[in-house]
Amino acid sequence: MAAFPFEIEATDGKARTGVLKTPRGDIRTPAFMPVGTAATVKAMTVDQVKDTGADIILGNTYHLMLRPSAERVKRLGGLHKFMRWDKPILTDSGGFQVMSLSGISKLTEEAVTFSSHVDGSKHVLTPERSIEIQADLLGSDIVMQLDECVAWPAEEARARKGMELSARWAKRSKDAFGTRDTQVLFGIQQGSTFENLRRESSERLREIGFDGYAIGGLAVGEGHQAMCEVLDYAPGFLPEDRPRYLMGVGKPIDLVEAVARGVDMFDCVLPTRSGRHGQAWTWDGPINLKNAKYAEDETPLDPDSDCPASRDYSKAYLRHLFKAEEILGQVLLSWHNIAFFQALTAAMRAAIAEGRFEQFRRDFAARHLGG
């Protein structure tokens, strides 16, 4: 039995709703995890994040190992204490950021060697070191294996090479992690847009055995349609009785369509990144508050929301804050967007539990995409 029980409470088609039970609290699924890159969800306090309904946040191994350093976080009591968040934390392995942000000098069977984007210093990240940073130094609740996220588009031979390396690193990650009572390890399915590779990746991961399974290598430029085509089959290759986590996704419509295909967990920087640039996500789609048409719009973003940022401030005021380059604008829109993503996952959980998810899916798409 896995350290964190996962109870699926209802299904509707392929969509599932349930609870992942952890020592630091329950994670209701489908779940959206706000991204706390450098030990903070940008522009938000932990109390604001909690008030939106978030059960879990994501921490970033790459950023934290470089600044302030994982060893320092450990000396300061671990990531939960350091950032004053007492609910579950999932940490990524650092692999994606190494591939996308840093100057990679070498990728070998043993490790990835890279230069810090902060100060140019050289670092070596192995599967074992990633586990040490996440589990032993940061002290996260859900730990991710180190993998290679192959850039898109990829030829099948290149995608296979990355998938096979990730599978070997999965075994090394599991060996380093061992068995723990208060932490779990997720494996990561790879294979780009090739069904045969994703099937093989999943078989190798299942053979090793993980507490949960992620779908990696999507939301890297392939677009919504191509992502959905992969998700038509990829979740089905993974165990039904464990959580399935789609990494780095995404837009609200991506979440709804992925849940329809059997995904349980998501993370993305989109809500806070959009919020810092004046974009609000709403049931009626995204709106750009810098647009002149909101200059005298006295309506709030969402009068029915429990979130003060959504309910209590006019679009005209929010637009003014961005035009005046006031920091409060970024705070309020980040807050609103995280609250909206949490409201969306809560609405999906209710729709699945009540057996009306397909109707919810159709209605959401019609309203959010404007028909």
From Swiss-Prot:
UniProt entry tagged with the keyword Cell membrane: no
Provenance organism: Caulobacter vibrioides (strain ATCC 19089 / CIP 103742 / CB 15)
Entry superkingdom: Bacteria
Family per record: Belongs to the queuine tRNA-ribosyltransferase family.
Annotated catalysed reactions: 7-aminomethyl-7-carbaguanine + guanosine(34) in tRNA = 7-aminomethyl-7-carbaguanosine(34) in tRNA + guanine
Region (RNA binding), start-end ranges: 248-254, 272-276
MF terms (GO), sorted A to Z: tRNA-guanosine(34) queuine transglycosylase activity
EC code: 2.4.2.29
Protein name, as recorded: Queuine tRNA-ribosyltransferase
Assembly and binders: Homodimer. Within each dimer, one monomer is responsible for RNA recognition and catalysis, while the other monomer binds to the replacement base PreQ1.
